[in-house]
Amino acid sequence: MVKCGKYVLILELLLLTLLYNLIKRVSNSGETVSSFVDGYNWNIMERWKAITPKEKLEYKVNYDLGLDIDAEIGDFGDYNSDVKTDLILFKYDKTTMISTIFVYIFSPSENKFIYHTEAKLEGKIVNLMVIDLNFDGSLDALVLFKDNSSQDKFYISTFIQNENDELEEKFNTKKKETENETISDFEDQNFYFTNIHPLLCDINNDGLPDLIAQHPNKSKSFSRFIWINDGDGGFKSILWENLNIFEYTDISEISNPNSSAIVDLNGDCKADLVFTVINKKNTKRIFLEIWINKIVDGKSLYVKADEDYMLPANSMQILFADFNADGSIDMVVPTCVKSSSCNYCCTSDDKIYFIPNIQTKICENSWTKNEDNKCRLASNLCSESDFEFAKKLSPDYISLLDDKGLHFSGDASYPSYLSVGDVDDDGYLDLLVSLRNDKGQKFVRIYKNEQISNNEQNHTDIRRFYNYYQFISSLEESTPDVYNAAFFDIFENGILDVIIFGTYNSNSKIKKYSSVGFVRSNETDSLFLKSTALNGICVNDCYKEKDKISTKTLGGNAHGPTFKITVIDANGTKSSKIGIQKSQSAHSPLQLPYVLFGLGRTSNYVEEFYVGMPTHEHSYYNMWVSIIPNSHIIVIPYPLDDSNKWQIQLSVNPSNKFYSIIYITLICLSVIGVLIFILDRKEKIEDSKEEMGFKSHFVIG
């Protein structure tokens, strides 16, 4: 009996060893990467191939995603509230002088984007933003367009999604100007157009998106004004100084192009305002004009920073994100020398500046005593902190493009934005960059985020970016002209794919649009957390009081919600990260309608999860604990003025390896169970025989 028990123990150990090796093999599968991935026959857009000099990542071109759309990309959003990100595009017809808006939704059953609806607009669209304009939970469209004149006169038009899922034009400032119809409650404040791309944000705390814009003024060169959302798909204009929520009225002219943003700079989980401006003292450089969202004497105000921050020379479109994963919003600024001979495209000295935000970090351990305010406790993660952007930028802060003759794409007509995303979920945000060389060859590269070694300067984690993965086109005549590229989670699995948007000339020399998707075909061992905040619309109880229950609630596309999380790494060190949902709107930044945090290799929960809404309320944020990684969290901030009643919905998205591990575990456990059952039966039979033999030695009289 004892001998048989030893056999069982030995078999269990052998099977457990086998189980461990199988799981390890499954976990390590998919790490072999081919030297290149061919992408032939990009329809008319010809041949592309993806070259990767590093391990871990593998992208494969996919022609079955329905991306061969003859229209220019405008924005991303969930049009039909199915938790899938859709495409909203537009195209201008020069002959008819009419633009068409197209909506392509992602179909889970077909695994591709399919045509859904379209709408017409008289005029040339220059920017398209999708957001819930009338607070009904459905995704609407806000259009920036111009007439036939060559001047920078940008009008706005709104398209509301009706009950038939179609876009219906509701408001048009060009038509209002033609009809001489007032759009302001104040005399002489009817602003029908702007000379810049406006910033989209909720400025007056009613939960509705407004627009901060600028109007040319003969007496003082410009007037900053706001288009206030009236809640019915329309807007009313008012001068900046008449809104009485800005403590300081001395302002500078917003640059054109601009990369203004609504981001949390001082770490209080409440979004602030940032404008790129032309400073009167130095008109050759671009500055940051910063307005901090504060409560002053019980009243919410935007308080201007003491001085504007001077950006590096020849700066382009700025990116705001937590690039060094320390819980504060940093900047990445691409720069180059431009030439008027090519419509102010980049011709030399292309660089990427990393500018960290220096502020108090989170305490690394929960038992740390914060007596000298040297660190921030996790419970105070949404409290205000002093901040400062680094000013003395040594060569350590600068990344080069690695190749001579390689430049950022884009020009004055289409300023180049870099796309931001964590490609391998290691916790550090990487860049997707559209490039061109002097021969006309087009490149799209992923520049990986890495730490500068042996850096002790200001105790700041300085990052640099290096060429990590490259998508390259052929040198044939029909090579597409790439105008944008973006990270995109096509299958909503927490893995960032890449979509490249371009134009080409058809056989009849007609300019056409198309795009191609590169799907990441392997996984890393790192985890992620995806978070989305709605705009404050009621999702559950309040619809009981209405005659018709709304089935669309996820089309908010809110701009400015702030997310903060804390995680503990394998060494037991606690760190925080911050992310802003839809922080920019000018010049088609192509930001996703959610924040995707890379968590790295951790076996722990997300310790704390904070969300703050861009309101002027005293109660503007809430916190939840112990969030499961590889999850998608949808925050329902209803009501906006009482954060204690906010709710979250969580859906877990396990990786593909999870199912393989489960299957192997079940098989091995079944085998172990069968062996134990067989050996147990054998042992009982032997025991029964021994018992019968023992009884036969006794004679019953």
UniProtKB/Swiss-Prot annotation:
Pfam family, one: FG-GAP_3
Lineage: superkingdom: Eukaryota
Extracellular side: 30-657
Topological type in the membrane: Single-pass type I membrane protein
Cellular component GO terms, alphabetical: plasma membrane
Role of this protein: May protect the parasite against attack by the host immune system by immunomodulation.
Name of the protein this chain belongs to: T-cell immunomodulatory protein homolog
